[in-house]
């Protein structure tokens, strides 16, 4: 059943040219449970940020595809719960492609230093270097610390993506 679900999701996303779903890509697919208790979570995004109407459009198309597939198994659309959504703030970046739309935003990044130790910094994503290549890097401007009421600037950090363990966009207060 898991393979049928994945096939339906990818089929719908591939067929979105010229529709509300154009430009949408799959971030992650999570399937929990089985039979009548199956819960399907589809996280999608675009390079400019996905809209609610796009999620609703894709949800309808994916549900239609799954219902056709499930009829052959004797199940109906009432036998599964489908949620199509955006990863949103507070969710870790999964795909390298997601970074581009977050340039300028505040991030909390956990990464491995050259010596193998782990470090966490918060700062603004300023740039993505060589995004199409293996040695891609992020340029993070760390949040400055305040000393005696004055903000002290911190130097930008360039982090290789292969050393990034977790990167989470955060809301600015």
Swiss-Prot record:
It is found in: Cytoplasm. GO terms for biological process: ribosomal small subunit assembly; translation. Keywords: Cytoplasm, Ribosome biogenesis. It comes from the Bacteria. One of its GO terms (cellular component) is cytosol. The keyword Repeat does not apply. Pfam families: RimP_N (PF02576). Transmembrane segments: none annotated. Required for maturation of 30S ribosomal subunits. Belongs to the RimP family. This is Ribosome maturation factor RimP. It comes from Chlorobium phaeobacteroides (strain DSM 266 / SMG 266 / 2430).
